[in-house]
């Protein structure tokens, strides 16, 4: 099975190859086989990307916003037309089940392009009356923006970052994760087909050194990263040396709080979505599931029953509900956390091992795992695992669970399940997290901002807020009378 692209990079509207760069094999996580081989960007490739972006950006920013938006909306249409093909590519790249990629990856990318393409013409500055004279503000492009992607939602992340940047009149250079480099190239082709001028969306492949080169480049005006907290800290420090704009969408250890009046099936469904979707490789996952003591026994019994029915197997089979983790290193990391959970006294209620799957013995599969009797100080309740490992914790009252939910360095997301809507609002109002749900979990419509508090990030993806993060404000004062000067 092969998925070799035409070349490693996409620059100035064309595929570009330079095999003097470091080789980067692309592995299909379900089988461990190499499906493509790309090459890391050399300094010449990086400079070519900046030259193309610089040449194109000024003319693009000068277009009417509605004209820029029209191209983004055409790109959205192209992604939807090619959704099946793109979803299969994303499954090969990430190992995620096709059942998921058909609805959550290229589809979400299309939603972002459609949203920002439609809203940009109404994103304007302010007018302030000053007693005859007046002032107004203009929202202007930053210039060349850089996006650095993660491996869990490659095409979605590429679009979530590039759509508002391009809508605002910027040029964009995107570096996908070296683990999942393929679908960003497909997005570049879709932009080209839709009529995006050459040089405005460029893709360069590579490892951390390429990311650092982009962050530190003199022409980079802004950096947007989706990744881990340690990576975010490094990139923010580098960007800070040059006072570059940054958006950071980082990790989490988010709480889901289930009160005893909650609809138990909905709460369990939300907890499963918040732990097992994308094989647990979702930054906003609610991996600390706090269940009221009156509901805990029934909740766990039914949760385990439903979890054991999850179908693990061939990701390209649409009946499969869970695929493998992205690579062997990630599986080894998750398995080590499972061992820590057992060693620290948590009860393994379900899963915890590597399933035996005919024809996929070299894949990076792992069973959906549930721990009970988890305490707040255990490693599995403190650190981001990024795999299908759920910790169930018991609580007895509202104030207690709010304090425990907030006792973390992270603040990306949170969820509350309750029949008392007033309590839902009251609790969410006290949770220190940037993206919250009441009686739902992990739904991320592009119309609203997504991002975190504390060490989970800075800035926001999506919603009108994202446009603000890809623009700068110019204030213009207009004097309608004579200048009053004491000199």
UniProtKB/Swiss-Prot annotation:
Q: Where does NAD(+) bind?
A: 149-151, 175-178, 228-231, 251, 283, 384
Q: Which domain of life is it from?
A: Bacteria
- Positions of the catalytic residues: 161, 249, 283, 461
Keywords, sorted A to Z: Metal-binding, NAD, NADP, Oxidation, Oxidoreductase, Potassium
Protein EC: 1.2.1.8
Q: What's noted on cofactor binding?
A: Binds 2 potassium ions per subunit.
Q: Which family does it belong to?
A: Belongs to the aldehyde dehydrogenase family.
Q: Which GO terms describe its biological process?
A: glycine betaine biosynthetic process from choline
Q: Which cofactor does it need?
A: K(+)
What InterPro entries does this protein map onto? Ald_DH/histidinol_DH, Ald_DH_C, Ald_DH_CS_CYS, Ald_DH_CS_GLU, Ald_DH_N, Aldehyde_DH_dom, BADH
Annotated Pfam families: Aldedh
GO terms for MF: betaine-aldehyde dehydrogenase (NAD+) activity; metal ion binding
Give the reactions, separated by semicolons, that this protein catalyses: betaine aldehyde + NAD(+) + H2O = glycine betaine + NADH + 2 H(+)
**Where does this protein hold K(+) 1?**
27, 93
Question: What's the name of the protein?
Answer: Betaine aldehyde dehydrogenase
Q: How does it assemble?
A: Dimer of dimers.
Binding positions (K(+) 2): 243, 454, 457
This chain's function reads: Involved in the biosynthesis of the osmoprotectant glycine betaine. Catalyzes the irreversible oxidation of betaine aldehyde to the corresponding acid.
Where Cysteine sulfenic acid (-SOH) occurs, the residues are: 283
């Amino acid at each position: 099975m092969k998925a070799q692209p035409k070349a490693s990079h996409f620059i100035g509207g064309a595929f570009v190859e330079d095999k003097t760069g470091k080789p980067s094999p692309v592995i299909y996580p379900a089988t461990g086989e190499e499906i493509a081989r790309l090459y890391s960007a050399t300094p010449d490739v990086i400079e070519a990307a900046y030259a193309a972006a610089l040449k194109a950006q000024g003319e693009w920013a000068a277009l009417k916003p509605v004209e820029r938006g029209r191209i983004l909306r055409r790109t959205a249409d192209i992604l939807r037309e090619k959704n099946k093909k793109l979803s299969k590519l994303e499954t090969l790249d990430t190992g995620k089940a096709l059942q998921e990629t058909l609805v959550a990856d290229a589809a979400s990318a299309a939603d972002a392009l459609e949203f920002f393409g439609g809203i940009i013409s109404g994103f304007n500055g302010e007018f302030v009356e000053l007693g005859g004279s007046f002032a107004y503000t203009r929202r202007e492009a930053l210039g060349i923006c850089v996006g650095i992607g993660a491996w869990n939602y490659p095409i979605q992340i590429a679009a979530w970052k590039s759509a508002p940047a391009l809508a605002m009149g910027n040029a964009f250079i995107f570096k996908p994760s070296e683990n999942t480099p393929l679908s960003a190239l497909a997005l570049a082709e879709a932009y080209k087909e839709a009529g995006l001028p050459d040089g405005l969306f460029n893709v360069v492949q590579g490892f951390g050194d390429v990311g650092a080169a982009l962050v530190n480049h003199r022409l980079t005006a802004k950096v947007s990263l989706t990744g881990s907290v340690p990576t975010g800290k490094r990139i923010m420090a580098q960007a800070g040396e040059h006072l570059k704009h940054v958006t950071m969408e980082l990790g989490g250890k988010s709480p889901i709080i289930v009160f005893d009046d909650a609809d138990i099936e909905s709460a369990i469904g939300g907890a499963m979505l918040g732990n097992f979707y994308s094989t647990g490789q979702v930054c906003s996952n609610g991996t600390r599931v706090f269940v009221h003591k009156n509901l805990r026994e029934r909740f766990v019994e039914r949760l385990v029953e439903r979890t054991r029915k999850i179908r693990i197997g061939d990701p390209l089979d649409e009946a499969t509900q869970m695929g493998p983790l992205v690579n062997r290193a990630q599986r080894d990391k998750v398995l080590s956390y499972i061992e820590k959970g057992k060693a620290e006294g948590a009860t393994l209620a379900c899963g915890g091992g590597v399933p035996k799957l005919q024809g996929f013995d070299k894949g990076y599969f792992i069973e959906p795992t549930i721990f009970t009797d988890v305490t707040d100080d255990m490693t599995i309740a403190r650190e981001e695992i990024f795999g299908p490992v759920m910790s169930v914790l018991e609580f007895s009252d509202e104030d207690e669970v709010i304090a425990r939910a907030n006792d973390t360095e992270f603040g990306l997301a949170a969820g509350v399940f309750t029949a008392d809507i007033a309590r839902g609002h009251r609790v969410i109002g006290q949770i220190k997290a940037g993206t919250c749900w009441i009686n739902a979990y992990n739904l991320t419509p592009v119309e609203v901002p997504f991002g975190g508090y504390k060490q989970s990030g800075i800035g926001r993806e999506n919603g009108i807020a994202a446009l603000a993060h890809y623009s700068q404000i110019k204030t213009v004062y207009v004097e309608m009378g004579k200048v009053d000067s004491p000199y």
